[in-house]
Amino acid sequence: MEMTHYEKTPLIRQVFNNGKTNSWFYVKHEILQPGGSFKSRGIGHLIRKSNEEALSEGSGKLAVFSSSGGNAGLAAATACRSMALNCSVVVPKTTKPRMVKKIQSAGAKVIIHGDHWGEADEYLRHKLMAQESQHGSKTLYVHPFDNETIWEGHSTIVDEIIEQLKENDISLPRVKALVCSVGGGGLFSGIIKGLDRNHLAEKIPVVAVETAGCDVLNKSLKKGSPVTLEKLTSVATSLASPYIASFAFESFNKYGCKSVVLSDQDVLATCLRYADDYNFIVEPACGASLHLCYHPEILEDILEQKIYEDDIVIIIACGGSCMTYEDLVKASSTLNVS
């Protein structure tokens, strides 16, 4: 049986203890992807499509190269394993040892280089890939988020949601918002692509959630043009991109999306609460979106409307494997989370 680079994930109605007697929230569980996050969709799609093109051209199998702080590298490694491709991942020194082991266990060669993702990426592209090219190999560079083919892969999440709502006899006009966490804008861009393809981009607002300290989208919106962050300080390291993809920034304004910025303390509290409530461990990048389930007043405020009993909000639980429960407890203690 051929392995696939991504799976159709459950869309589950969940009741949150948030002071409301009804539940509006349907959660899309991307943590169940082969690579532990939504990144399996887009990165797997890029690798599969590029490999098929290389084979059709007679170039042979690709040598795949990924730079990542963790989740993108794991997605690349698991996708390559499903296609029997060699994969090299460069991670910065800040990457947790358990994440390095996860990527290695998925079959990739891991090189640790640089103090942050930018230095790891520079080394990957200008040293490792240059060396491989000299050997005559066909190489593929996998960016963590800023690639249109990756967005195309991520867009399948919207197709699935529409199909799953239909299976549950839920009409699309009942959907009042779709909530996702935003770092560099890869998932957000894919969602916009999927909504647009299904003629829903102007009908269903996307609520983009960031954490203070890596809120590059919100800061760009306030300035009126994309900015680059010199420092990334949030505990939600999977959202820590110094810039926002141009397509994401342009789409935000085009389709009237909404921006929310949360504190690290709020997000960590949600991660611990969600683990206690549902026995799911999510990292802060994922907890950012789930926070709105526990605090629907934030959602109503940003949408400037009440959410009623028959209304539905879709939450993308984007996944991620960068933190254990012990990591969450330790970070919460450091930040005095009550």
Swiss-Prot record:
GO terms for molecular function: L-serine ammonia-lyase activity; pyridoxal phosphate binding; threonine deaminase activity. GO terms for cellular component: cytoplasm. Its cofactor is pyridoxal 5'-phosphate. Keywords: Cytoplasm, Gluconeogenesis, Lyase, Pyridoxal phosphate. Gene3D superfamilies: 3.40.50.1100. It is found in: Cytoplasm. InterPro entries: Ser/Thr_Dehydratase, Ser/Thr_deHydtase_PyrdxlP-BS, TrpB-like_PALP, TrpB-like_PALP_sf. Pathway: Carbohydrate biosynthesis; gluconeogenesis. Belongs to the serine/threonine dehydratase family. The keyword Lyase applies. The modification N6-(pyridoxal phosphate)lysine is found at K39. It catalyses: L-serine = pyruvate + NH4(+). Its EC number is 4.3.1.17. The gene is SDL1. The keyword Magnesium does not apply. This is L-serine dehydratase. GO terms for biological process: gluconeogenesis; isoleucine biosynthetic process; L-serine catabolic process; threonine catabolic process.
